[in-house]
Amino acid sequence: MSPRQPLVLVFLVLGCCSAAPRPHKPTVVVFPGDLRTNLTDKQLAEEYLFRYGYTQVAELSNDKQSLSRGLRLLQRRLALPETGELDKTTLEAMRAPRCGVPDLGKFQTFEGDLKWHHNDITYWIQNYSEDLPRDVIDDAFARAFAVWSAVTPLTFTRVYGPEADIIIQFGVREHGDGYPFDGKNGLLAHAFPPGPGIQGDAHFDDEELWTLGKGVVVPTHFGNADGAPCHFPFTFEGRSYSACTTDGRSDDTPWCSTTADYDTDRRFGFCPSEKLYAQDGNGDGKPCVFPFTFEGRSYSTCTTDGRSDGYRWCSTTADYDQDKLYGFCPTRVDSAVTGGNSAGEPCVFPFIFLGKQYSTCTREGRGDGHLWCATTSNFDRDKKWGFCPDQGYSLFLVAAHEFGHALGLDHSSVPEALMYPMYSFTEGPPLHEDDVRGIQHLYGPRPEPEPQPPTAPPTAPPTVCATGPPTTRPSERPTAGPTGPPAAGPTGPPTAGPSEAPTVPVDPAEDICKVNIFDAIAEIRNYLHFFKEGKYWRFSKGKGRRVQGPFLSPSTWPALPRKLDSAFEDGLTKKTFFFSGRQVWVYTGTSVVGPRRLDKLGLGPEVTQVTGALPQGGGKVLLFSRQRFWSFDVKTQTVDPRSAGSVEQMYPGVPLNTHDIFQYQEKAYFCQDRFYWRVNSRNEVNQVDEVGYVTFDILQCPED
């Protein structure tokens, strides 16, 4: 084995599925949001052989000898029967989940010997998938690391910040590292070899269905099963159920049995539902209230209106416009679709597709054989869809494979090895002797005698027991809701700022008007904040000049350094980002993440500081460093490297080397020395419409 650069699990699928002969060619539809392409067997083989280094560009033609030679190389590498033909076994191997690094030839590499030079490796779980409870995800990652610590001197310690060696992230599509995911059943995950910055990090595609390899894991609340997960399928009144149901209840609250036979065992719990609670937000875990009013319109279900990140939310009072209380709706992972253009939404049955009614998931219209459903009653009209739940991918096994790459391992050519390119589910011990030889070549054996790695995931995931009253039948309604939001949930917006804004200035005699140049200026919580050497003033524009301060920055944001370069607040999530040198701090209310290095955002070493930020709406922000800028995604907290632009071209008339770039009252300000240039965007054209003094014209200081 040899270390290589990022390792990407890929699921390639054929353009046609096995089916009985039909009198006519089946209709294949282009589904909105679907990145899969329909390929013939030969096209698939040519693309596969080229992508993984078995053929060259010039050979991608009708040259049968080149194709046969490439197939033999592939078959030899993957320990397949060496026929040189595009046979069934070879095609199945090409369809299987696997890493995307070439098997032959060179790939872009990082510098160094690509191993860690310390034995205590730290890791940080930056965010979570909604497919599994957080404690189950924590456990899966811990067991995946234990696979490698069992046979080496390495130890793995969880930390809670970006200083970690290995940062674990769930993301979708373009997530900031230049290796985008491509939706359901495409790229599963990738990892980078050991080293600084992004090296060592592991990313997982959040459009996949993450399970323990045997179907969805649905935690229960209340009932009489002490929080045990649902058991699918289960029997109720002689009928089999493979998802949560509202049958037997008059309040339409979904429930499930936690054993295979409710009729015999009578053990049950309630499935995640907005009827029980809404998570995160500022609604204190209370259930959704339907109908509720938002922007004058009545809503009787959860909605994504008003949000650009696709999260479903609801009001926890009857009038959001008045009370501003909300939460995010729990995802029904037992029935929620993945991928497509409606991830997280449940299937709607029956639905209309090409004029025909469907009451179950179908393969019709697809060339890859995957089951799908509409998430509205009429696909022909609404074009809303997703893939139906399946067994999913074992987060434990995929993580163990990816962490092998994060430790410096390349792929194995032994089919039984964990580091073999293709993913396969197993409940046995994941490590093969080839894996052990590879990792011990890098780090040596564990000093204890003959340790054994973990053998299998637990039969039941750890869960949090419900605090509600026990009940005896699913026909009975729970008498109390949960006391707070569940552990799992989106990372979306708490709306509250710090618990208390300071009201008493440090030194009221310290006049803001005597400051010539500020360290940073930013609009935060509807006030324009002026930062200088560990202090700040708040300014609001109204009748007369209204300035409060100075206040000590650590009294509001304790982790911040004395000198700031820039800051901004995201209007959707209410997260506040502070930049100083090559570091960034992210505050959500009183909670902070950081300092993080700028390279974790995707900004290279040439970016020595972030000199300003302009929110663009929709969770996007322009980050500036002198004469360059990049588009920053607040949700993934990464920049799009392809978005780099020139300030001179985008904002003509603005001087060189500006600082304190900020947005105020929907206009952009570029400061240089004591002056500012205000930019107004009319008809998508940026024009300087005002030049003035920061103190005299913005702060309305008197001219002495």
Curated annotation (Swiss-Prot):
Residues 225-273, 283-331, 342-390 form the Fibronectin type-II domain. Ca(2+) 3 binds at residues 182-183, 185, 187, 205, 208. Residues 1-19 form the signal peptide. N- and O-glycosylated. Ca(2+) 2 binds at residues 165, 197, 199, 201. Glycans are attached at residues 38, 127. Its main location: secreted. Its EC number is 3.4.24.35. PROSITE patterns: CYSTEINE_SWITCH (PS00546), FN2_1 (PS00023), FN2_2 (PS51092), HEMOPEXIN_2 (PS51642), ZINC_PROTEASE (PS00142). It comes from the Eukaryota. Binds 2 Zn(2+) ions per subunit. Zn(2+) 2 binds at residues 99, 401, 405, 411. It is an enzyme of class 3 (hydrolase). Zn(2+) 1 binds at residues 175, 177, 190, 203. The active site is at 402. GO terms for cellular component: extracellular matrix; extracellular space. Residues 450-461, 483-496 have a biased composition (Pro residues). A motif (Cysteine switch) lies at residues 97-104. GO terms for molecular function: metalloendopeptidase activity; peptidase activity; zinc ion binding. It is found in: Secreted, Extracellular space, Extracellular matrix. Its cofactor is Zn(2+); Ca(2+). PANTHER family: MATRIX METALLOPROTEINASE, MATRIX METALLOPROTEINASE-9. This is Matrix metalloproteinase-9. The gene is MMP9.
